[in-house]
Amino acid sequence: MIKNISNLGDAALYCDFGKEINKDINTHVIKYFKTIQKKNIPGINNLTPSYNKLIISFDLKKINFNKLKKIIDNIEIIKGDSIQNKKFEIPVCCEKEFSLDIKRLEEKLKMKEEKIYESFFEKEFFCYMTGFIAGMPFLGDLDENLRAKRLDTPRVKV
């Protein structure tokens, strides 16, 4: 499932799983991440998964790019292997004073406020990762009918 493995500087390896962002690709990234973690390969310093990439940093004194690439190329991921997913409930506040974009969304989506919220809350989302702010989820698979572009000029204060 890895499309390409290349150098990322002199002490990191970049595993590319494709350009798309979807559950299947992300699941493969996480399977490789967990498998490599379990193998405890000498010389690997850090593993960083993303939507569709896996970066592996390593200690050049213990392993080189070619040797590590060969190991990664030969890792076998069993199709039936599954990832233990966790289910999280994320509280969302829809009070008027915090719904700064609702009017813009009503106009853009041509939907009433109630329908926007109803459509949003009727679905479970896939969490691709958490990041920057502790626990900040990167959710995916938002219904096409609810998609809107970002503000041209972001708010300075929220």
Predicted feature descriptions by range:
Residues 1-158:
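Conserved "landmark" site that anchors the functional core of diverse proteins
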